[in-house]
Amino acid sequence: MKYRNLGKNGPEVSEIGFGAWAIGGSWGAQKESDSIEALETALDRGVTFIDTAAGYGNGKSERIIGEFLKSRSESVRVCTKTPPTPGKWPPSPWCNINERYPEKYLRENIEQRLKNLQTDSLDVLLLHTWTRAWNDQPAALEILQKIKAEGLIKQVGISTPEHDQNCVIQLMREGLID
């Protein structure tokens, strides 16, 4: 397995990660024992990075990972994602970021991520969707940086839209994401 640093100042993680969408049941019925076996196999082969999200089985994926990691001693980094408030997906460039990611909602959502993953601090939290138009009004990222300073998040980022992955470059330059 090859390893690299996660983000600009992050810890070393495996270049191959475990994508946990399927273990949440979003792709159909999934036996929890099969999910645990898949996680065990990945970690046994050197994987140290797991990607999940609030929306993967309505938090089921996170809960499985949180319970599973209690039985392992490896240093594993978990990246999870918080969705915006209900509305058009992906968000329209004309919608207000403050309505889709208000501070109260972000804080409540982060508390649920912490509970599901059975941890006191999230390794990586991504906003689960983004639009380039929000680059000029990054209030949600500023809120996440404040929550990071409080110790509830170690690294902040965004899940970029497939059609506009370069929208993140400006945010990286401005230090709003890790």
Q: Which residues are covered by each model-predicted region?
A:
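N-terminal binding-site loop/beta-alpha segment at the start of enzyme catalytic domains
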Residues: 1-77
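Glycine-rich, positively charged active-site loop/lid region within alpha/beta enzyme cores that binds
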Residues: 12-14, 22, 26, 88-95, ...
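Short acidic capping loops at alpha-helix termini that bridge into adjacent secondary structure
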Residues: 14-15, 73-76, 80, 120-124, ...
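Active-site beta-loop-alpha junctions enriched in small/polar residues
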Residues: 21-23, 53-55, 81-85, 127-130, ...
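Short glycine-rich, flexible loops that bind phosphorylated cofactors or substrates
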Residues: 25-26, 58-59, 87, 134, ...
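Hydrophobic positions in alpha-helices of CheY-like receiver
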Residues: 69, 82, 144-147
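Structural motif corresponding to the early beta-alpha repeats
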Residues: 71-101
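Glycine/proline-rich, positively charged
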Residues: 89-178
